[in-house]
Amino acid sequence: MAFWKPGTEKPRFEEDGEGGIVFMSNNLASSSSSSYGYANIEKQRQRLPVYKYRTEILYLVENHATTIIVGETGSGKTTQIPQYLKEAGWAEGGRVIACTQPRRLAVQAVSARVAEEMGVNLGEEVGYTIRFEDHTTSGVTSVKFLTDGVLIREMMEDPLLTKYSVIMIDEAHERSISTDILLGLLKKIQRRRPELRLIISSATIEAKTMSNFFNSSKKRHAPEGSTPGPKLEPAILSVEGRGFSVKIHYVEEPVSDYIRSVVSTILLINEREPPGDVLVFLTGQEDIETAIKLLEEEAHSNQKNSSGLLPLPLYSGLSRSEQELIFTPTPRGKRKVILSTNIAETSLTLEGVVYVIDSGFSKQKFYNPISDIESLVVAPISKASARQRSGRAGRVRPGKCYRLYTEDYFLNQMPGEGIPEMQRSNLVSTVIQLKALGIDNILGFDWPAPPSSEAMIRALEVLYSLQILDDDAKLTSPTGFQVAELPLDPMISKMILASSELGCSHEIITIAAVLSVQSVWIIARGVQKEQDEAKLRFAAAEGDHVTFLNVYKGFLESKKPTQWCYKNFLNYQSMKKVVEIRDQLKRIARRLGITLKSCDGDMEAVRKAVTAGFFANACRLEPHSNGVYKTIRGSEEVYIHPSSVLFRVNPKWVVYQSIVSTERQYMRNVVTINPSWLTEVAPHFYQNRQNAMSF
């Protein structure tokens, strides 16, 4: 594998970054790595590129209902703008400044940094809220960080978000479903609350497109004699300057194995380049663990090229202590190699990174409304993501980005922007969120990127089958309203409601809590046999959901839970989180009038409750096949994932929670069922398919 080298004929150098080669700041002498880490916090803040725009930002927010800020990676917009707003008085009189992020890890990291800069305890003046975790103090917290989804749920209690004076939607370019819903809802709220200020912030978003979206609002007519409100036309501000130049290297030929290419590039950097940490973008936990294992093998066989390397994973399922390793200073004589998902593209500032390796791929959700399968697939990234990734280098000195794809591919084949999640996802949760907020005409909702009518119709059909919507596509009472109240996937919520009638709500709420964390299992390198043996200690013949009950029971009964988790390859932090989530769900269930009862070991009741929620995900084993299943809807070919306790068991009928696509479509979290339950729990859904099934 060869790269174009700086100073040779290729790659091209372009000031505007279209080829992604060099990014220059306005004043390269404004920051130095030697003084940056030792300066006090106030001087650090003043050195950030966004600081010289402080007055302009506050003027625009004062005079415009919506301000769109395009700030390059590392400009400081995420941490500084909320502080500027507070300093300017936008949090006086009990008002709150909100800043949303698409990811939970970013919410936690950014809020901690802002609290540190303001010299306050996290959870008091500065706080954060993510699903199942609220670190705010009512009447005290004035700067609040939260996910887009949490802010949407707050609208169920306060439709006009009256406590907020300014809402900043950060990293809007990610275009998650929650971000797009939030943008549409905030546009509606502004018509009723002209005093509400919105800031749309991103590193790459097309500002004019977003401006046109907010500029298309229906004109408000102020009462005669009233004080004129802010201008409706959005203001656009570009915050330039990131610190240091970044040179881009492309491979000369396409690579056949991007994980091995990543490892060889890490070793190349370690052998030839001056000190500086490396940030690697891979697709997910499995890729990251594989790359780390290859690096460790290289360390044993070739110590010269790999000496001093300190590989660290970064993905959303890590414990807090593992996350903190990412942000700690690199030990003397070491080079941190942070192997990350696209979580490191936005918001998280990783000081010390000088080199970036971009695999060119990420995991993305894609939904097929015909087969009704939503898959997590490895897909090429967009130019916008590529620029975000390269922008992570060059924060402490001139940096380099190694792209594991050709320059021709970047310039002529890579798409400019990614497809918004709204246009490639299952919309069941989206529909119920909007219905719960009183929006009946969903097809007429003002979307930044309209979803497909096929996906919307399919979502309405599933919700009708779940008895969440009635014949008029309105929330049913009480089922629909109860499901909307639970902060869970609607299928998991329906599973909980069914458990109340089946007398197994304690068990199903436990399962729901486990499904709400990334994973309770730890994927350790080089000990696959020991891991498999540990999982077998809890394995239940009925499937993964019942296995989760065994894991939870063992955790509660363990006298030394930390050591017990270590011995059984379980994530202690995840298990603690399961206990917390379970307690919260029990409180919500009581408030909703759901009867809490244990089935005392009746696993048929548990499996039936799971089926009541996930009946649309039923599959049947193909006769005389080697583990091939066919979905009842769409007749898609699927397989049980190797991580399931039912792998190689191949029961005749199952339901699954989700599908992950690699070379095959694999079912995750699988449980055995009796096929007769399908028409019992979902007669509307299966009445037209009954003849096609051999019950």
Swiss-Prot record:
Gene3D superfamilies given in the database record: 1.20.120.1080, P-loop containing nucleotide triphosphate hydrolases
Pfam families assigned to the protein according to its UniProt record, in alphabetical order: AAA_22, HA2_C, HA2_N, Helicase_C, OB_NTP_bind
Cellular component annotations (GO), alphabetically ordered: cytosol; plasmodesma; spliceosomal complex
Reactions accelerated catalytically: ATP + H2O = ADP + phosphate + H(+)
Domain annotation Helicase ATP-binding: ranges: 58-223
UniProt-recorded Gene Ontology molecular function terms: ATP binding; ATP hydrolysis activity; RNA helicase activity
Organism of origin: Arabidopsis thaliana
Family named by the database record: Belongs to the DEAD box helicase family. DEAH subfamily. DDX35 sub-subfamily.
Chain location of the short sequence motif DEAH box per the record: 170-173
Enzyme Commission number(s) from the entry: 3.6.4.13
Residues the record lists as binding ATP: 71-78
Domain Helicase C-terminal: 261-438
InterPro entries hit by this protein: AAA_22 (IPR049945), DEAD-box_helicase_OB_fold (IPR011709), DNA/RNA_helicase_DEAH_CS (IPR002464), HA2_WH (IPR048333), Helicase-assoc_dom (IPR007502), Helicase_ATP-bd (IPR014001), Helicase_C-like (IPR001650), P-loop_NTPase (IPR027417)
Annotated function: May be involved in pre-mRNA splicing.
UniProt name for this protein: Probable pre-mRNA-splicing factor ATP-dependent RNA helicase DEAH9
Entry-linked PROSITE patterns: DEAH_ATP_HELICASE (PS00690), HELICASE_ATP_BIND_1 (PS51192), HELICASE_CTER (PS51194)
